Amino acid sequence: IKGFRFDVINVISKPKFYENDYEGDGRRFYTDGRNVHKYLKELVAAGGIDGMITVGEMSSTTLENCIGYTAEGNHELTMCFNFHHLKVDYKDGQKWELMEPDYLAMKKLFQTWQEGMQAHGGWNALFWCNHDQPRAVSRFGSDTTYWKESAEMLAVAIHFMRGTPYIYQGEELGMTNPHFT
């Protein structure tokens, strides 16, 4: 399979000048910028990757933007990684302050993205883990008593959705966090 994974590709279009951001952390200036679709089309055309599988990691983007990136006629990306479902255990929206996952919110996010991408011709890259995330069995399941059942449930959940599943190394074995500390 020939293809490329583009890390945080939706932040390649930035303004020439930044103003003070009193409304947040500055993402509105550099996420899904004005020229990002133009740049992606140029990259596909000039990079010799038309017809290859391309997946883009999307930082803080919307469903509508992912549809735009992946709709078949747009010639930008084959599919998108979005991280909204992995933020359901962020306490007060902070990545390093965790709480019990809100499974109902996760279910609603999956439903919204599944229905939205299908209705508008987009395509999801489905995943639980990557190099920036803890192991899904430890995070969203039980890594002790119900380790096997948790691993199977998470695998079935991802593989029965519409999209292309990605399996992070060790995930096929139901790998858990090492709990060093």
Which residue ranges define each predicted feature?
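Active-site and adjacent substrate-binding regions of carbohydrate-active enzymes
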Residues: 1-181
